[in-house]
Amino acid sequence: MARSLVESEALQMGVRRLSSPLTSPVQAEVYFPRLTVPFCGHIKGGLRPGKKILIMGIVNLEPKSFDIRLTCGDSEDPAADIAIELRAEFADKQFLRNACVSGKWGEEESAIPYFPFIADQPFRVEIHCEHPQFRIIVDGHQLFDFYHRVESLSAINTIKINGDLQLTKLG
């Protein structure tokens, strides 16, 4: 039986939604229909050890910076806790990370073996939630670990992305 183009696209969209790396075959936990920057999306059920977040995109042609934040909600006043902020700074070629709990920023970490991002090139960032840290993998290479500063992993339920990049996939 032949399917119309609309039916085929709808079926493919449904398959993509249910086969995301953060989902079980039965229920989608993370589904982002529009990937515009700045981006804010909900992570159903929050984080837990074993859960992975995938961010794929393309760095803009003349980038200054971009950041990825995992937060405990999206409140602005009072500001939600930031479990991890990853910030790529192109002028200094740094990939910085920090957390902000109860309105107080911790000590910023900056040591990396190399700067993985290139202007006008695609990238793949994986944030693995493990016990007791986040493991950050860029383009298949482990770059660093960042120890949890937020006590309740399940409270980390929002992802925010901003800056000089185009998003192509989240999962």
Curated annotation (Swiss-Prot):
UniProt keyword annotation of Oxidoreductase present: no
Galectin domain sequence ranges: 38-170
UniProt GO molecular function: carbohydrate binding
CDD domains the record matches: GLECT
Entries under Pfam families matching the protein: Gal-bind_lectin (PF00337)
InterPro entries in the record: ConA-like_dom_sf, Galectin-like, Galectin_CRD
SMART domains assigned to the protein according to its UniProt record, in alphabetical order: Gal-bind_lectin, GLECT
Keyword annotations from UniProtKB, A to Z: Lectin
Superkingdom, natural source: Eukaryota
Matching PANTHER family: GALECTIN (PTHR11346), GALECTIN-RELATED PROTEIN (PTHR11346:SF98)
Function according to Swiss-Prot or TrEMBL: Does not bind lactose, and may not bind carbohydrates.
This protein's name: Galectin-related protein A
Species this protein is from: Xenopus laevis (African clawed frog)
Lineage: Eukaryota, Metazoa, Chordata, Craniata, Vertebrata
